[in-house]
Amino acid sequence: MNSRILIRGLLFVMSAVSFWVYGKEDSAEKDPWVGWHRPVDANVFTTTKGNNHDSVLFVEPELEYPYHLIISHTPQYAHLWRSKKFSWSSADWELVTDQYKIGNFYEYDDGVKVDGVYYIYEGGKVYTYSGPLEKSNGKWKVSGSFPHKQCDDIGIFYENGLFHMFGEHGNFPHGPDGTSLAHFTSKTGLGDWELVNPKAVDPNPDGGHKYGVGDATIEKIQGSYYIFCDRESKGSPYKVTAWRSDSLSKPFQFLGLAITPRSDEVDDWDNYRIQDPDIAYIPELKRYVMTCNMMDKDGNPGGNFSGSGLKGKDTRVIGVFYSDKKLSQKRK
């Protein structure tokens, strides 16, 4: 009798401890915007344009071509695509040019359009252009700067007259990341950046540098602010994680893993890692999409990636992911 009571007591305590330890994470994981899926099994935008990575997606429903996708390629050129209707596949897009010139960078972090002006951020420089993107090749100008040594591989978000920048901060010893994401603001998006919080996103709340983060993308969804960004640790390649806050001026809370590589398979383009997300709302789908850089290292399915800066059997392509949840009404 006593042993039964003791066992029941232990089970109750274990259950209570389990709830206390995991309750917050379990409730966080129920957030609908943590759920993402591949629209098809091989959700690759294109496999024939060599090393593709670090995409920037502009959605402008008022234009004849509402969708423009800039894909980083080499320091010499990026690629510019456009489409009248959204699709995960380049077969439904038009390649404007595969010799698209912004600057001389291997990658471009993020972009935003404000009051008719496009802004692109990379390497501490802010590029701007006004006019149709189809005519922008070679016409981007360096109009400003940002503190990339304190805030690198950034995501940019504009609201109520302020540019909000979130980027890598601190020294992560196991890869090209930060130990947190810092938050800066600017009224112009071109300079006079003010530090709001060096740890707006903190994957190491207990200190140290177990996790590295970077390459943020930011969106306001149903009244809350979401950041999706890379996270890695020693021996664990990039995955896309989700974070949420009810205010841009408050720290973001970890929700969980949003998009992960299929590391237990051998015949996919995303067996090794998934990173560099860029989020946008697609009105015709009534859902959000993310374009991400997917990397594979085993050469299966492989392809012609020679001369594009990759080594051995490495491949890098852009993959498109859809949010599980749709919006039944106009987003706010």
Task: Describe each PLM feature range.
Residues 1-10:
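Bacterial N-terminal signal peptides that target proteins for export
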Residues 13-21:
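Hydrophobic h-region of N-terminal signal peptides that target proteins for export
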Residues 24-332:
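Carbohydrate-active catalytic/glycan-binding domains of CAZyme proteins
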